[in-house]
Amino acid sequence: MTQAPDREKALELAMAQIEKSYGKGSVMRLGDEMRQPISVIPTGSIALDVALGIGGLPRGRVVEIYGPESSGKTTVALHAVANAQAAGGVAAFIDAEHALDPEYAKKLGVDTDSLLVSQPDTGEQALEIADMLIRSGALDILVIDSVAALVPRAELEGEMGDSHVGLQARLMSQALRKMTGALNNSGTTAIFINQLREKIGVMFGSPETTTGGKALKFYASVRMDVRRIETLKDGTNAVGNRTRVKIVKNKVSPPFKQAEFDILYGRGISREGSLIDMGVDQGFIRKSGSWFTYEGEQLGQGKENARTFLMENDEVANEIEKKIKEKLGIGAVVTDDLSDDGVLPAPVDF
């Protein structure tokens, strides 16, 4: 057996040769490099940021958002885009469904003038454009809406009744193999919005599955299941939806946490509604009957009135948000620049 000093010398020579061939940093001891906190992009809902465990969507990773129709998938993605832009980032939207509403996006806070938008003809074109944008290194967030609309060229050029089994799954698998390393190097967050389908003949367990094969399930660091659970009403008028998001996969924090928040029609995720819910849960806002009180000051009777008060008094809303984040230890790092607020815990890879 080779003596320990000889083995160490052989290892050093091998590492030197690898670095000479592939560049400095191509191989290293994990202990030699200080672990960097995971930079995040806030989602727009403090409840969802808490459920994700790190204060938002991780940068440099693949994120999948899926759920039934009109459940709020695109709204969640657009809020992340707005937050990335607010921090000075560059955002791109691959609109494969050709259904992006610029006016709605603007109401959610998206800077539509600077948003890069592509409406590709084929799935290959969409993913090639996405890959080129990611490799530019200039992008902070990329949204692909949706995986189901990424139609392979062969299917588009074929006849209506032709069978094209597995084409889309192979396309997604190849694209994700190429993209994953580039995403990590550039720090770009790629959000894939996906639709649900039902498997035929399933007797036990959920028959629901997502489109595009299994590759996205493996490559995604975060998978979020978005569901509409209740219609919000003001009197008899429907004004929005109560939405539940379950984190079904999370490689950067413990998974299977849930978050609930309000999505208001024409306005998106209600930041104030999330602050009221989390404020009550964490003991900063007192609820007595239907009245909400913060530090002796009445916010209003009923959630709608309390929501209106916080919308009109932004400094109170910011104060509540700051206290919640400080107590739960989230939101310290939201860009690539390290702050003095503290270091996030090391990621847990499940």
Curated annotation (Swiss-Prot):
Primary location recorded for the protein, binned into one broad class: cytoplasm
Superkingdom, natural source: Bacteria
- Record's protein name: Protein RecA
**Organism encoding this protein:** Mycolicibacterium paratuberculosis (strain ATCC BAA-968 / K-10) (Mycobacterium paratuberculosis)
Does the keyword field hold Translocase?
Answer: no
Alphabetically list the UniProt keywords: ATP-binding, Cytoplasm, DNA damage, DNA recombination, DNA repair, DNA-binding, Nucleotide-binding, SOS response
> Which cellular component appears as one GO term in the record?
cytosol
Q: Tell me, what is one Gene Ontology molecular-function annotation carried by this entry? A: ATP-dependent DNA damage sensor activity
Q: Which SUPFAM superfamilies match?
A: P-loop containing nucleoside triphosphate hydrolases, RecA protein, C-terminal domain
Q: Name one Pfam family in it.
A: RecA
For the ligand (ATP), the binding residues are 67-74
Spell out the PROSITE patterns in the cross-references. RECA_1, RECA_2, RECA_3
User: NCBIfam families in the record, alphabetically?
Assistant: tigrfam_recA (TIGR02012)
This protein's record includes keyword Transcription: no
A GO BP entry:
DNA recombination
In terms of InterPro entries, this protein maps to: AAA+_ATPase, DNA_recomb/repair_RecA, DNA_recomb/repair_RecA_CS, P-loop_NTPase, RecA-like_C, RecA-like_N, RecA_ATP-bd, RecA_C_sf
Query: What does the sequence similarity comment in the record state about its family?
Result: Belongs to the RecA family.
Q: Write down the SMART domains for this protein, in alphabetical order.
A: AAA
The entry's function note states: Can catalyze the hydrolysis of ATP in the presence of single-stranded DNA, the ATP-dependent uptake of single-stranded DNA by duplex DNA, and the ATP-dependent hybridization of homologous single-stranded DNAs. It interacts with LexA causing its activation and leading to its autocatalytic cleavage.
Location of this chain's protein in the cell: Cytoplasm
